[in-house]
Amino acid sequence: MNKQTYYLIADIIQRYRTWIIVKDTELLVEMRILQDGVLKTLFYKGLSLQSYRDHYSFRKKRTWKINEYDLNQGLAALCRKDPSAKGRVEKGTLTRRDVEYIIEKASFGIVKLELSDYEY
């Protein structure tokens, strides 16, 4: 994922937020993978999202750390689902629905942003 797309996702979340804010975009998220029978530690840049009000079962100040690898997987899933999304990514014109889908896939269905023009 390129920097422009990464920061565009963070900007769209911050601009159209309803219950989650972007707390940090420069966070290093630790991830471990099994390679050749050995656990390797990798560090990815990640988004830190925080709820600023109670929403469903999530309490205020709940924080999610979503690494760039998972965001990239969500972006790939979006491009598979909607072939026109690839053009929007290249032009830097992602929509709110695109970002909601990316974050939902990147968080394994846990975080549903519910972005809107109006804050509730």
What annotation goes with each model-predicted range?
Residues 117-120:
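Short acidic DE-rich linear segments
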Residues 17-22:
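Short, solvent-exposed loop/hinge segments that bridge or flank secondary-structure elements
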